[in-house]
Amino acid sequence: MSGEWGHLGQTLIWAVWVLAAATEGPAADAPVRSTRLGWVRGKQATVLGSTMPVNVFLGIPFAAPPLGPLRFKRPKPALLWNDSRDATSYPKLCLQNSVWLLSDQHFLKVHYPNLEVSEDCLYLNIYAPAHANTGSKLPVMVWFPGGAFETGSASIFDGSALAAYEDVLIVTTQYRLGIFGFFKTGDQHAPGNWAFLDQLAALTWVQENIEFFGGDPHSVTIFGESAGAISVSGLVLSPMASGLFHKAIMESGVAIIPFLRAPDDERNEDLQVIARICGCNVSDSVALLQCLRAKSSEELLDINKKTKSFTRVVDGFFFPDEPLDLLTEKTFNSIPSVIGVNNHECGFLLPMKEFPEILGGSNKSLALHLIHRVLHIPNQYLYLVADQYFYNKHSPVEIRDSFLDLLGDVFFVVPGVVTARYHRDAGAPVYFYEFQHPPECLKDTRPAFVKADHSDEIRFVFGGAFLKGNIVMFEGATEEEKLLSRKMMRYWANFARTGDPNGEGLPLWPAYSQSEQYLKLDLNISVGQKLKEQEVEFWSDTLPLIMSMSTAPPGPPVPLLSLSVLLPFLFSSAP
């Protein structure tokens, strides 16, 4: 892929521009940097509590617009541009149902810029300390946003505070979503995984251009939350990504999370939906692609709302095998990693969108019904789940709490721990955390029983309390929360610098060894050991073993990793 992107003609033209810069020079009122495709003119920003200005470059194209004949194809190189490109405006969102973002702003007390949507969306944003220039060789951190692979944007995250306080370069990038990012025909004509290939294109752009912004292409850390973390985990597993990054941080998401693979019957159902809505011939892949490429983006969005299997696939290229098999075979990129979860991943935000009635309390009958519906566990095995989670639990509140813990375990904690073990056993340095602090600013927008919910840590990682721009990520942070945020920014940046999050003035974060120590990120940071040991054993060993030995109609051999689950509410994109 890199040969296509490092086109000789583009390099020669870029060299001419560099020579011209020696006589012209940048304007004094805005930062200007060269890229291999042309010049970009950004703007400067400042953050609270720091004297270091930040150069901000928004909407830099890393690939050609995936329009018309490029729809459902690998991304192509971006085209050269003349003059200096304005990089002061946010790029458009990739096509999605933007109503989801609006609802998240209310529940999470955040604010995003007013952004339009477009199929032309393969852009990235860069936040660099103002002193950074060619030769600075600062660590680079590339952020992949979450959103269930259905929603999200690079431009709802502001990297200014992290760049200013920690002297690192932050890149936030976009990728195609939903049907645009994952449609596949099941053959060579459209193998799918376009979103992951977009991410490869962005990382290739970083390798070829980030030094002109002061970054070190040999020190690139990829990080993300939820679907973004799943992307990071997938990139670590993919042979196509080898050499494009050097460290990885996965916040509340890994590639073996159950819902990521849709069964064949659901794919077939979706093809019938496509045929009904668009009138396309679904029996011929070439004709189907030609038909879909001629449809409007609105028509495809309509399909997206009525289907459910636009997910990752083993394509033989990006994923040569199932993620669990790649982990088992130790054929992945063995690099330092941070993996973590929050202590109430399904406390409010995710269940509120799917079954809000459970939040007030539940009984065992309703809880088991929902477990069967959501997890597809056969009825004859539900008693095992009940014994594990509801034994000696009688009140509606106790049952609700156990049910929400169960969801968090299945979709986040257990996959995270299992992945960390595979990385550790492959010889790669691993650091594990559990984030435990519920933001004070959210106490009046969600129930009192909610602890650190899904995505709560993002505002701390990005230093949201120190931002001054039109992206509001952490309004009303307490002084203690600001201190925790500073510590988390330092941990993350130290890891990006050296592959080890530890440093002067920080509580020790032990590596994830056979003793399975992990860091408890709270106002008072401490060390824990063997996170959810019994629950991990139940889902990864006990239940699969009993199901495999049973004479009952066979269920999935490893329910944790092969459940056919599609939760459209999962992986909200917001901080």
UniProtKB/Swiss-Prot annotation:
Glycosylation: residue positions: 82, 281, 363, 524
One Pfam family in the UniProt entry: COesterase
Alphabetical list of SUPFAM superfamilies matching this protein: alpha/beta-Hydrolases (SSF53474)
UniProt EC number: 3.1.1.1
Keyword flag Secreted: yes
Any one GO molecular function term: carboxylesterase activity
Superkingdom of this protein's organism: Eukaryota
EC main group: hydrolase
Active site: 226, 345, 454
Reactions performed catalytically: a carboxylic ester + H2O = an alcohol + a carboxylate + H(+)
Similarity annotation: Belongs to the type-B carboxylesterase/lipase family.
Task of the protein: Involved in the detoxification of xenobiotics and in the activation of ester and amide prodrugs.
Name of this chain's protein: Carboxylesterase 5A
Gene expressing this chain: CES5A
